[in-house]
Amino acid sequence: MCRRQEFHLTIAAKDYINDKLVSDKWSPMVISKHFESAGFDTISHTYIYSYIRKDKESGGELYKSLANLNKYQGKKKYKGSISNRVSIDKRPDVANDRKRIGDIETDLVVSPKNQGSSIVSSVDRLSRFCCLDKVANKTKESVSEIVVRGLSNIGFDILTITTDNGTEFIDHESIASQLGVSYYFADPYSSYQRGSIEQLNGLIRRLIPKGTFIDEVDYHLIKTVESKLNNRPRKVLGWLSPIEYLMKQDGCGEIGQLRV
């Protein structure tokens, strides 16, 4: 099992991160990609975000140099209501760094005013393969059932799930138990930690525009959108589609189950 990196940065390493953030306006992702070539041990961008968060908690202002400042700060202090939640800080590095298939991000695409039906969207962090389904309401029982149904038939082994702190995911322990996975929660108001699902939801909104009542979207259309996205070439995959990328990987022998 991968162990999380501890905060033992040298003074020189901290100075490098601080300078690139404040002076050069580099993102944590860019800094992490250049960290080793600058003469330091390799670190992930999530490690740098954690470093920034600890600096903020100590009264520092590094966070003000982030491009997504508004999302990072949030609107108010979060008061959690989900018991036994495991923080994304505990998620293994192999999942953070997109080194394998099976690490999933899940979310809801909701109707106006959060009323009525929603789309349960899930995406594999490495392949960008997605699974979309319709849920009649946001109760924990309904959402849990749809998440388990979709990911049980996705066509490859699921290893981890990461979501936000919405109360619709309060039944996370049941989901994790039924699927045999580890379940993690992103930090409150930290959408940057769930970049894959944020991007997927943006693509969904191109085909099902924001403001659409999901009650009026039939199941067939949702599955058509799913198929379009899974067959859409991606630059990050070397211009392969998620389906094409998965077909080239070992361990995806049940490719026939994948929705094309």
Task: Give residue spans per PLM region.
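Basic, flexible linker segments flanking DNA-binding modules
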Residues: 42-96
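C-terminal domain-tail junction helix/linker
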Residues: 210-260
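Short, basic alpha-helical/linker "hinge" immediately adjacent to a nucleic-acid-recognition surface
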Residues: 1-23, 34
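Short, basic interhelical loop/turn and adjoining N-cap
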Residues: 26, 35-47
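RNase H-like two-metal-ion nuclease catalytic core shared by retroviral integrases
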Residues: 163-165, 170-173, 185-208, 215-226
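Two-metal-ion RNase H-like nuclease active-site motif
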Residues: 101-111
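Mobile genetic element proteins and their domesticated derivatives, centered on retroelements
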Residues: 17, 31, 48, 107, ...
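Active-site beta-loop-alpha junctions of metal-dependent nucleic acid enzymes
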Residues: 112-115, 132-155
